[in-house]
Amino acid sequence: MPKLDRRLFLKGAASMAALPVTLREALAIPAARRTGTIQDVQHVVILMQENRSFDHYLGCLPGVRGFSDPRPLLLPSGKPVFHQPVGGGTEDVVLPFRFDTASTRAERVASLDHSWKAQWNLWKNHDAWVPVKTPLTMGYFTRADIPFYYALADAFTVCDAYHASVFGPTGPNRLFLFSGTSGLAAKHAGPQAVENVDDGNWSSDAAGDHPDFAAFPWTTYPERLEKAGVSWKVYQERDNFGDNPLSCFAPFRGDQNNDLCRKGRAFIDGPEEKSFGQNLVAAFAKDVAGDSLPQVSWIVAPTAASEHPEAPPSIGEAFTAGILTALASNPAVWAKTVFILNYDENDGFFDHMPPPVPATKPHFGASTVATDGEEYGGVPFGLGPRVPAMIVSPWSKGGWVNSEVFDHTSVIRFLEKRFGVIEPNITPWRRAVTGDLTSAFDFQTPDDKPVMVPGVTGLVERMMASAKLDEPAVPAQQSLPRQESGQRPARPLPYRLAMTDKVGGTVELTFENSGTTGACFQVVSAGVMQPGPWSFTVEAGKTLTGDVTVAKSYDLSVHGPNGFFRQLKGSGPSALRIEAKADAKGGLLLKLINEGDKAVDVSIADGYRPGADLPLTVPAKGHVEDKRPGESLGHWYDLSVTRADQPGWLRRLAGHVDTGKPSITDPMIA
């Protein structure tokens, strides 16, 4: 990347280093409401940055599903997923540790391995992070290290279930952002589907294109917008770090005088080796001031501002602040604009949430929706790990958390929803499982209260001062991180999920989805050398039953969207079954069914109310019910049912009852 000369950097970043009063004033401007729908959005601005995972950036943010997740995945060792094994025959582990920007050069570390995951057996247990990525994979930042981004999340909406599209590098993930696929769904199963494939011209200047490069043949979303008459543009400088994938498609190569090239390949000229995004910000600000911003804008940052691990987050924060300041300079434009900040992939940085994957073969599980275009080399290839994503707009103010599952195709689907231009490259499985971002907004009654976002003055100076410090390292005395305390408002979600089990020779799991969007359930068997994991995808309004083969003794965990969790422990067949359904008021109704010939004494423990255990007797060939109101806990529940005659038997049920109304984040995370 460009050498970070202190004098040149401070001069180039001066326009982005302090957040002017204009932005703070603009944050109080209400949305330009005409219809109270998504049609009020006139501009969508998309900034995709580089190579950061969600936990790495925002795992300490209050309320999100981060380091204080009360129900994390358990590894084969029996330890929570945060205890990542070193491997090599030892029992040593690496815990998440802080990338302290005050005492180390954590803002500028070498990029870690972030290649295509390739082997299912290597990654299926989510425990290969340290052996493959090195201990630096477990590094994370806090509010003290990236204060602008934490403040942005406090002021607007953060998405804590937004995933990369591919468990792999930048190239295929950016192809998903610009075309809805990395090729498989378009019947182009070349290496670009999972690897970085380009012609080596890592700049915007088409003069550097290699004529012998085999251009990708499928249609991009900008081409569809162009055909539909929706205005669009890519903002980039000469140095774009090779992050504009349009350069790999035939319509954007060769003659640069056509409309597609003028919008998709043109660049803002400037001193290539000394750019920190100031030229791009100035050109963007000019279009905003002149009310000539297109309906859809993609912003591609120069190398130094890209936030790739060698590129300091503080420069990225200053760059993002510059874009937002430009938008705020014209309040009329701000009032009708959506700004989406996301990251293409996680580099090699750890995230504790296993990504949803489709069952592309029977031994992976089952799906009610087709999984065509979702397999590469015999392995399910999406989704990837979680990455940071924030929605900044007058319709998303208030410090909200949105926990609907998204990926990069969700950005296109938001554009589909607003402009009516459909992208056929998005697979049925992704359309079922990932949302369209609309749940992150309140178009009808947006929050008009003013919000506070700090400036970025001093951050870049701190980064320059840390350049000579040591690289961060795993501390001698390790301890688990804790998130900042407190709950956050949570957006209404489209999930209404249930699961029941029937244990005989196998464990039969029945998944019921009465919500309005699909859900992917991941089933894990505890212990070493166990079968699985399995994935079950259930479309909205459907039910799916699948068998899981286990030993006589079983210990299964089921993870689904928005904290949905079930745990099943026992030995041999069980005549006791439990059904849990949401009631009309957002509470939970438990029905304990005894199909055996003897009464069963059980106890129900409430994880949110320790000591309030409820003893019940379930009569032979009968049932009992227990109703749990949800209002006092924001409709969260965590119940454990045990039976007196079988000490090893357990059914744990946890999650959230979505009511279609705003709620709060999980109290156990607070």
Summary of predicted features, one role per range:
Residues 2-670:
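N-terminal pro-sequences and low-complexity stem/linker regions of secreted or lumenal proteins
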